[in-house]
């Protein structure tokens, strides 16, 4: 046996390493938190890494988890060694195939990063809701508790499945295990060969379907035999626990790590025992070890085998002295007599004829913390004479009173473990740097190391908290650090937003990235921060990491700067050695992105320590120390102050059950209260240079730049610094004009500056919008913004929507989202909310737009002064088109019903009023405004009628005002998982609008390839470059002939985007808008992304067109191209995107081959669209359509 090899990696990689080696076919589909297992598999296959039998596994991405399960089923039936990975809703889509796979006794292992199921809300975080929904499929279910166990059980589960023919579901906790970095011992291939028997593999192959030995499976059976046939599998399941134990024993002999299906630890004469499975067992073991050392007779039973459930083995694993048992489930089954594990344990003891006191409890739903204090709380609760059954721990249930008490100050943290916490921003690289730090510590010292990273669901601007532990012994602490020796705050703004120093221990180190120097920083610390520093005797260090990063050319990414500071202060390695290791990790991490990126990071490392200063700490707090600002102002609504404000302050765990809505319904228009201050620079308007075109407003991803025209009298109480000028548009003569920025909501992306066409003639590098540091401007611009909001909005009926400058005066009803800085999707959502938001219903597919659009604590969908605004909901990823169609048919029916009821009141209202309402076509803004007035008039006249008929009418009266239904999602939904439903809706003819924000990848799950991904682009799940062309969704929709279709790119042509939205809404049927949306996953400069869209259109890589079937009624061609012929080859534009450029570095010949094919795709597509657009309805070529000659041959020659 070879010497042990150690590596520091997370649970996903630990599992994928084994699953890859033991597979020939791997069917994948992305879903958080399991996606990295598929990503690793795809990357290794792209590197031609062989499996255990010397062949490279075939990795295939499917359109959904249902598709992946079907592919797995087919591959298994054909004799291949096959696996897949999933979680949550993805597992739900696999259930039908799982029943089949198990029923056919087909060996395989499905690896699941266990995650919550969407119920009253979606959650990407971990519990056992998903796997418990699979417990009746016939799959064996094995639970691993740590990264090491996940690595080991990937092998044990597979070996047992081959030996028994029973497929296995191997699960581990999402995020807590899947994303936790741990130093583990890797399994050498000889151990895998020792456990995987050749005879089992050959038997599996021998059962394959083949025409050389034809047989039939998947029959339809009748009542005469189905029952008997179902019972034939009993011997296989009965033998499984014995076989598993044999495999575990052999594994222990080979590795020295010993497991049991039901493993007890604790006092040999324990009286109180906890039973549970998953990562919580590690915390429970740490706590039980601590308490038994103090003489307490307590214990823990780790359940590793959940299905088949071997009750006799579970009972026999416990000491005979046990009197009370608490069974903990990490899921909730509403309406059940108890959660699954509880019921199984209860049944096991009943059948054994032994009945200690057994109670059940719930813990840890959606990655809710499970700490030693809670474990002790459960054990203490068992000490009561009549302990509460069906309890919860870790929450305050003041509604049903299920929660039990515990002492949160109880701790089992060892003094030998160094504990560090880092507060960062999703876009600053903190998490990535800390993952590298953990690897350096784990692999270059004798320490064991653990890293865990807490994210919220916002995009790249989210708060991240990294928890690092390292010490001389294995680390079982699967919970967040509450007592930190080292605290680093990588964003100055956090100090005034939440309690950064609360976990710091006495005498600890505090490192802060600050815009202030060492001499001035103390007086800038908030009063509470100063007091904590003094009270806890903290050593304080500061660096202006933003300046260091900017000077090195790294922009906002301060990660390597702060990482260097950490190693310099922590002393875990000699300083020079640490810096050398950091540089090695930089090369490894950024090498694929180009040597320039590597050199920038190394430059930052080299210049860091010269800018790191220790801060002298006074003995008392400064008299003029600033106070921490309130999380939300006093004038915010009560629910915002008392509930959402707590979540914003990172105190959501303290909210009681009664504070939260029972059905998941939340108010809109709440992002206005969350001032994140994440933009270090904000745009500053120069009215003397501005041409008042509106471009900066229309492209702003977060609706923080707005324009208004108003009468001069409105300026009477304007702040001194409030800027304005005379309105230039002849429609607004005599009015004043202002462009104003919301300073605390701006993310500092700089897109507005890049698109601004107005140049300062005296200083050519300046424009009408220029970036400036936010901090000095914050107070002044906050006052200006508040004043600006109080200015009246222009009358919507007076605006000419054919002009951008006019249209952008419409109030956005989508504002301040948590999307990435420079997001390419949100400008479209803002635009549609401006145009139709006051009458709009949104069905939003799961994806980026559902997360920044509907993630707690605040939501960007807003309301106007009348309280109207978009009504929004998310169902699932796969059913959004059908979900939105449900909106439409319900509205149509209720509108019809309202009309029927209205007619019955003709006597009270008069025929004229009834007729006026029913005959209003509502095709214009003015029509809709008039209809609202008429309907309101009717409601006023009928509201005092207390008849059932009147009350019924009033409940549906508002449906007489036209409602605009928008079905919104990304390309992963529209091109892949939801395409079947989308196609059905396209064929329905119903009046719905569909907006596909095409980022050409699965942006929400981290940038995996979809069928929208263009050929030659590198993405996750397409590590070797996507070999196939992009799906043409628009052309497919056009084949119906009665669907309005538009392909738009706001950065290429603003006016065409507006026109497409207006036409889509006006079209009396299905409309589909496909909107190019740049994304950070493209590896581009987000500041220049809008202008890059124009370059893509100029190259023909993206087409601008509108297909309006109504034109056919006029004898015109429905297809209108809104662009000229391609002007440049695509390789002159796409290589500014790293997703294309990186393949030229890793596989230059393959990159060249794929790029040539990609250019051919563009040429062919353009030629076809141009041909279609030039045809008249009679079939002849219309030579006067555009007057532009095609040039695909010229383009082809340049490639």
Curated annotation (Swiss-Prot):
It is an enzyme of class 1 (oxidoreductase). [4Fe-4S] cluster 1 binds at residues 690, 693, 696, 756. PROSITE patterns: 4FE4S_FER_1, 4FE4S_FER_2. It holds the Pfam family POR. [4Fe-4S] cluster 2 binds at residues 700, 746, 749, 752. Oxidoreductase required for the transfer of electrons from pyruvate to flavodoxin. Belongs to the pyruvate:ferredoxin/flavodoxin oxidoreductase family. NCBIfam families: pyruv_ox_red. This is Putative pyruvate-flavodoxin oxidoreductase. The lineage of its organism: Bacteria, Bacillati, Cyanobacteriota, Cyanophyceae, Synechococcales.
């Amino acid at each position: 046996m070879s010497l042990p090899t150690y590596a520091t990696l997370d649970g996903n990689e630990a599992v994928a390493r084994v699953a890859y080696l033991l597979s020939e076919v791997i069917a994948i589909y992305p879903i958080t938190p399991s996606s990295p297992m598929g990503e690793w598999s795809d990357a290794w296959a792209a590197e031609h890494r062989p499996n255990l039998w010397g062949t490279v596994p075939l990795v295939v991405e499917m359109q959904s988890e249902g598709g992946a399960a079907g592919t797995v089923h087919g591959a298994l039936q054909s004799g291949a060694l096959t696996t897949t990975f999933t979680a949550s809703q993805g597992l739900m889509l696999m259930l039908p195939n799982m029943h089949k796979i198990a029923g056919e006794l087909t060996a395989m292992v499905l690896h699941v990063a266990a995650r919550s199921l969407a119920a009253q809300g979606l959650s990407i975080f971990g519990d056992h809701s998903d796997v418990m929904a699979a417990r009746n499929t016939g799959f064996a279910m094995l639970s691993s508790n740590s990264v090491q166990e996940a690595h080991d059980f990937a092998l044990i589960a597979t070996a047992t499945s081959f030996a028994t023919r029973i497929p296995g579901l191997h699960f581990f906790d999402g995020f807590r295990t899947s994303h936790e970095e741990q130093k583990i011992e890797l399994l050498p291939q000889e151990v895998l060969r020792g456990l995987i028997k050749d005879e089992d593999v050959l038997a599996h192959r021998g059962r394959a379907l083949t025409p050389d030995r034809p047989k039939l499976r998947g029959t339809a059976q009748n009542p005469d035999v189905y029952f008997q046939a179902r019972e034939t599998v009993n011997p296989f399941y009965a033998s499984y626990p014995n076989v598993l134990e044999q495999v575990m024993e052999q594994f222990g002999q080979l590795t020295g790590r010993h497991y049991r299906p039901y493993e007890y630890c604790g006092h040999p004469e324990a009286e109180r025992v906890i039973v549970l499975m998953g990562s919580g067992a590690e915390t429970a073991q740490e706590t039980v070890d601590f308490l038994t050392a103090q003489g307490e007779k307590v214990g823990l039973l780790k359940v590793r085998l959940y299905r088949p459930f071997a009750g006799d083995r579970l009972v026999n694993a416990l000491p005979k002295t046990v009197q009370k048992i608490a069974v903990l489930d990490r899921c909730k089954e509403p309406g059940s007599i108890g959660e699954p594990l509880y019921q199984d344990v209860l049944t096991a003891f009943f059948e054994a004829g032994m009945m200690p006191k057994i109670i059940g409890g719930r813990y840890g739903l959606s990655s809710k913390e499970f700490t030693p204090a809670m474990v002790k709380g459960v054990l203490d609760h068992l000490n009561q004479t009549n302990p509460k059954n069906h309890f919860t721990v870790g929450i305050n249930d003041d509604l049903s009173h299920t929660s039990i008490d515990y002492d949160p100050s109880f701790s089992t943290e060892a003094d030998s473990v160094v504990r560090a916490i880092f507060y960062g921003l999703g876009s600053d690289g903190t998490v990535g740097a800390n993952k590298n730090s953990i690897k350096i510590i784990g692999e270059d010292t004798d320490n064991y190391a653990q890293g865990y990273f807490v994210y919220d669901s916002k995009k790249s601007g989210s708060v991240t908290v990294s928890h690092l532990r390292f010490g001389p012994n294995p680390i079982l602490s699967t919970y967040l650090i509450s007592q930190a020796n080292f605290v680093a705050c990588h964003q100055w703004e956090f100090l005034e937003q939440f309690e950064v120093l609360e976990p710091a221990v006495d005498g600890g180190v505090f490192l802060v990235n600050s815009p202030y120097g060492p001499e001035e920083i103390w007086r800038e610390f908030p009063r509470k921060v100063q007091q904590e520093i003094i009270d806890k005797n903290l050593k304080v260090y500061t660096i202006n990491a933003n300046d260091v990063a900017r000077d090195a050319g790294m922009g906002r990414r301060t990660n390597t700067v702060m990482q260097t500071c950490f190693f310099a202060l922590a002393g875990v390695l000699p300083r020079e050695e640490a810096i050398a290791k950091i540089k090695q990790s930089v090369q490894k991490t950024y090498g694929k992105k180009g040597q320039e990126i590597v050199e920038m990071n190394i430059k930052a490392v080299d210049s860091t320590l010269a800018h790191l200063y220790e801060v002298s700490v006074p003995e008392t707090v400064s008299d003029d120390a600033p106070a921490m600002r309130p999380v939300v102002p006093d004038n915010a609504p009560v629910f915002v102050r008392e509930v959402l404000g707590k979540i914003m302050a990172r105190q959501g765990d303290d909210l009681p059950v009664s504070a939260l809505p029972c059905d998941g319904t939340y108010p809109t228009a709440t992002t206005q209260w969350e001032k994140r201050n994440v933009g270090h620079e904000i745009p500053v308007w120069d009215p003397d240079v501005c041409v008042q075109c509106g471009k900066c407003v229309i492209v702003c991803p977060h609706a923080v730049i707005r324009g208004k025209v108003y009468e001069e009298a409105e300026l009477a109480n304007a702040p001194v610094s409030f800027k304005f000028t005379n309105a230039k548009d002849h429609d607004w003569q005599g009015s004043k004009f202002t462009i104003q920025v919301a300073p605390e909501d701006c993310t500092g992306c700089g897109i507005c500056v890049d698109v601004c066409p107005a140049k300062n003639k005296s200083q050519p590098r300046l424009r009408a919008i220029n970036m400036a540091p936010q901090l000095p401007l914050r107070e002044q611009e906050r006052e200006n913004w508040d004043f600006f909001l109080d200015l009246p909005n222009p009358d919507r009926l007076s605006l000419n929507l054919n002009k951008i400058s006019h249209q952008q005066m419409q109030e956005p009803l989508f504002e301040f989202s948590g999307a990435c800085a420079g997001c390419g999707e949100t400008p479209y959502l803002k635009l549609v909310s401006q145009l139709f938001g006051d009458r709009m219903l949104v069905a939003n597919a799961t994806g980026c737009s559902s997360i920044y659009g509907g993630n707690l604590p605040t939501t960007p969908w807003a309301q106007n002064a009348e309280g109207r605004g978009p009504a929004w909901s998310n169902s699932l990823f796969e059913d959004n088109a059908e979900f939105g169609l449900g909106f439409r048919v319900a509205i149509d029916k209720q509108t019809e019903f309202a009309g029927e009821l209205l007619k019955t009141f003709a006597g009270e209202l008069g025929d004229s009023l009834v007729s006026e309402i029913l005959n209003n076509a509502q095709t214009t803004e003015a029509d809709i405004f008039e209809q609202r007035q008429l309907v309101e008039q009717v409601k006023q006249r009928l509201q005092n009628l207390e008849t059932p008929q009147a009350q019924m009418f009033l409940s549906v009266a508002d449906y007489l005002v036209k409602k605009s239904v928008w079905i919104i999602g990304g390309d992963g939904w529209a091109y892949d998982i939801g395409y079947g439903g989308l196609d059905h809706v396209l064929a329905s003819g119903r009046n719905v609008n569909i907006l596909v924000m095409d980022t050409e990848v699965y942006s929400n799950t981290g940038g995996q390839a979809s069928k929208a991904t263009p050929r030659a682009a590198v993405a996750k799940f397409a590590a070797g470059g996507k070999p196939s062309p992009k799906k043409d969704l628009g052309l497919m929709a056009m084949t119906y002939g009665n669907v309005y279709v538009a392909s738009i790119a706001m950065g290429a042509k603003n006016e065409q985007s507006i026109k497409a939205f207006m036409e889509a809404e006006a079209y009396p049927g299905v409309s589909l808008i496909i909107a190019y949306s740049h994304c950070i996953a493209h590896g581009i400069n987000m500041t220049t992304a809008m202008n890059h869209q124009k370059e893509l259109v100029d190259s023909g890589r993206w087409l601008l067109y509108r297909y309006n079937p109504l034109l056919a009624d006029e004898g015109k061609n429905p297809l209108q191209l809104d662009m000229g012929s391609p002007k440049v080859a695509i390789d002159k534009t796409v290589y500014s995107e790293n997703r294309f450029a990186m393949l030229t570095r890793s596989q230059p010949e393959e990159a060249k081959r794929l790029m040539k094919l990609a250019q051919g795709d563009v040429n062919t597509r353009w030629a076809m669209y141009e041909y279609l657009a030039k045809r008249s309805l009679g079939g002849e070529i219309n030579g006067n359509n555009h007057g532009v000659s095609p040039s695909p041959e010229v383009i082809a020659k340049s490639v």
